């Protein structure tokens, strides 16, 4: 099956690799795409694992998973990347995630901040 992150790759060749081993994620954009796919699959464990410990919403995990299951994920558009390459330790990715909730088309438009620590990328927060 095609990867839900809209990379045009197969899931097994894309976000499944990250979902299996987060250390395989090489860029901030790849982590952001893998997190989008984790929302599509309501993979709360990965969403928590890929969220930086300083901002990780552990107490909201059940609600996040419940919400992720309740919407129909339609599309991810990556708009802009700043740094976040394999050689970097920080970066930002601006994106739009389009989904349908209660019959209405909705959109999350965010510029996300990422940090790489000990070779592993993490989502920190929205700027």
Residue ranges and their predicted role:
Residues 1, 89, 119-120:
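Beta-strand-connecting loop/turn residues
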Residues 1-34:
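Short, low-complexity N-terminal intrinsically disordered segments enriched in polar/charged residues
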Residues 22-23, 55-58, 120-126:
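Short amphipathic alpha-helical segments with coiled-coil-like heptad repeat character
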Residues 24, 29-57:
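Internal alpha/beta loop-helix hairpins
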Residues 49-78:
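Short solvent-exposed beta->alpha transition segments
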Residues 67-107:
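Surface-exposed, charged secondary-structure patches
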Residues 106-127:
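Short beta-strand edge/turn micro-motifs at domain boundaries
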């Amino acid at each position: 099956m095609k990867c839900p992150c809209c990379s045009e790759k197969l899931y097994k060749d894309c976000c499944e690799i990250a979902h299996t081993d987060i250390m395989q994620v090489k860029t901030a954009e790849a982590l952001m795409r893998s997190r989008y796919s984790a929302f599509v699959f309501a993979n709360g464990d990965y969403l928590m694992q890929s969220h930086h410990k300083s901002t990780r919403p552990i107490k909201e995990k059940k609600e996040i998973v419940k919400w992720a299951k309740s919407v129909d994920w339609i599309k991810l558009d990556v708009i802009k990347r700043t740094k976040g390459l394999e050689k970097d330790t920080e970066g930002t990715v601006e994106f739009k995630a389009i989904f349908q909730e209660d019959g209405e088309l909705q959109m999350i438009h965010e510029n996300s901040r990422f940090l790489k620590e000990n070779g592993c990328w993490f989502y920190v927060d929205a700027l």
